[in-house]
Design a protein with these regions (language model features):
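Short amphipathic alpha-helical segments and helix-helix/interface helices
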Residues: 14, 18, 52-56, 156, ...
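Short, structured patches in soluble enzyme cores that scaffold and shape functional sites
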Residues: 31-33, 68, 105-107, 209-211
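Nucleic-acid nuclease catalytic cores
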Residues: 1-8, 15-47
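Aromatic/basic micro-patches that form nucleic-acid/chromatin recognition or nuclease catalytic surfaces
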Residues: 64, 93, 135-220
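Short glycine-/polar-rich loops that comprise or flank the Walker A/P-loop
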Residues: 24-27, 62-63, 126, 163-166
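GIY-YIG nuclease catalytic motif and its immediate N-terminal context
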Residues: 83-150, 167-176, 215-237
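Domain-level recognition of nuclease-like catalytic cores that cleave nucleotide substrates
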Residues: 34-90
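Long, charged alpha-helical interface segments
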Residues: 71-77, 211, 221-224
Length: 237
């Protein structure tokens, strides 16, 4: 999936190429994927939905291709492996402002925090991963979680007053993955806060604690990759 960060310039370039096509100019794009095991290509709608929407529009008229490459051991000569397929139906289905998400927070010191009706809870210092979902307006929901000034509503709102947000990880999807994500993170987390953020489901928790930033853990990033990308292979079948 491309890009790995928001690219406003990339979005504009794609739309400019499409506009040139409309004027009768033959235009195209070549994406080189430096991973020889790749079989399909999609714009990363989780990271940059605006670019993904622009790509979906422009792909209909551009002469474009995505090519997987294999490098030799000395990293001097790339070898073409295969042209990648474009599962555009996945993009049409999944690129919406809804889905599931994880918010990574840092608590600098041990704290006893009042969490609404749950009362006071002890939180060891460290990093916390909160899992949630939004059936619509997910971008606005994530922006809200990052603000401190707001009316208290969810459990996470109370904790946010004492933490800094280090990452937000949207997983745009029409599927209901929130509880699967929570169970996956729970399986690798050293501890969780019982009953946090899960009053409407049977999960043990939706808040999971780590001594160090989970963004730097391979098992956590594997969860991100699995829910953002690897599960799409099943949908394609």
């Amino acid at each position: 999936m491309f890009p790995d960060a928001v690219t406003e310039r990339g979005r504009k370039h794609i739309l400019e190429l499409a506009a040139m096509h409309d004027k009768g100019i033959h235009t195209g794009v070549l994406f080189l994927v430096h991973w020889d095991k790749a079989h399909w290509f999609l714009p990363d709608y989780h990271t940059d939905p605006a670019f993904a929407s622009a790509f979906a529009q422009a792909a209909l008229v551009l002469d474009w291709k995505a090519l997987a490459l294999r490098w030799d051991a000395r990293f001097t000569t790339p070898m073409p492996v295969r042209l990648l397929t474009y599962p555009e139906e996945i993009l049409r289905q999944e690129n919406e402002d809804r889905g599931d998400y994880m918010v990574v927070l840092q608590l600098a010191a041990d704290a006893d925090i009042s969490i609404g009706a749950k009362g006071q809870i002890h939180f060891p210092k460290g990093y916390y991963v909160y899992t949630g979902s939004a059936q619509k307006n997910m971008a606005a929901r994530l922006a809200r979680h990052q603000r401190k000034r707001k009316q208290m509503h969810w459990h996470i709102d109370y904790l946010r007053q004492h933490c800094s947000v280090t990452a937000v990880i949207p997983i745009r999807t029409t599927a209901d993955l929130e509880h699967d994500i929570a169970r996956a993170v729970d399986a690798i987390a050293p501890w969780h806060i019982p009953g946090f953020g899960c009053t409407d489901c049977r999960c043990a928790s939706h808040l999971f604690g780590f001594e160090d930033n989970p963004i730097h853990r391979s098992d956590f990033m594997q969860i991100v990759e699995d829910f953002r990308m690897n599960r799409l292979t099943v949908l394609m079948q």
